[in-house]
Each structure stands twice: as C-alpha cells, then as structure tokens.
Amino acid sequence: MGKLTLLLLVLLGWLQYSLWLGKNGIHDYTRVDEDVASQQGNNAKLKARNDRLFAEIDDLNGGSEAIEERARNELGMIKPGETFYRLVPDQNRRNAQQGRPASQ
C-alpha cells in the first residue's frame, strides 16, 4: 500500500508541476487569454472603421448630396450663381491670441 501511495503522490506532483510551470500551463493560458482579449478589442475598432467606410460608400453611391458636400469641403467648389466668401482672421488679432507681438 505504501508504494501505491508514493506513486500517486509522485504522479500528483508531476501533474501539478505541469499545470503551473509546464508548457501550456496556467501561465501560458493567461498570456494567450490576454492576447485574445487585446485582439478582440483591435478587431472591434477595425470593424467600426469598416462600417463607417461602408456607410460612406453607400452614401456616395446613393445620392448627389454627399458628392456635392465633399466637392464643397475638400475641393472648394461652388454652384453657378453662388458667391463664395472666405473669412481670413486679422493677422494682428491672431498674433495677439497666440501671445506674439504684431509684426510691422
């Protein structure tokens, strides 16, 4: 009976060592679990970005308002008969807001 108990204790010790310190043990499991959580967060961000891009593509394919808005904002285009006004801040006022002396 003593040999069987000793054998079972050695087997239990080996299993505990493998569980805590061995390959594919608890430490490896927690590291992989953290990596999976990080990758899932990254995937969620990329999915949200893809959804925004698909929505923009659908908007551009669906109507002329989105195309017109982009032409106005990015290219500075105007419709025939419209007057375009560009408001440029006064240089002295801009320098005063930034704390620099006015250049003469």
UniProtKB/Swiss-Prot annotation:
PANTHER family: CELL DIVISION PROTEIN FTSB (PTHR37485:SF1). Its main location: membrane. It is found in: Cell inner membrane. This is Cell division protein FtsB. Belongs to the FtsB family. Residues 1-3 are cytoplasmic. Keywords: Cell cycle, Cell division, Cell inner membrane, Cell membrane, Coiled coil, Membrane, Transmembrane, Transmembrane helix. Residues 22-104 are periplasmic. It comes from Erwinia tasmaniensis (strain DSM 17950 / CFBP 7177 / CIP 109463 / NCPPB 4357 / Et1/99). GO terms for cellular component: cell division site; cell septum; plasma membrane. Essential cell division protein. May link together the upstream cell division proteins, which are predominantly cytoplasmic, with the downstream cell division proteins, which are predominantly periplasmic. Residues 33-62 form a coiled coil. The gene is ftsB. Part of a complex composed of FtsB, FtsL and FtsQ. One of its GO terms (biological process) is FtsZ-dependent cytokinesis.
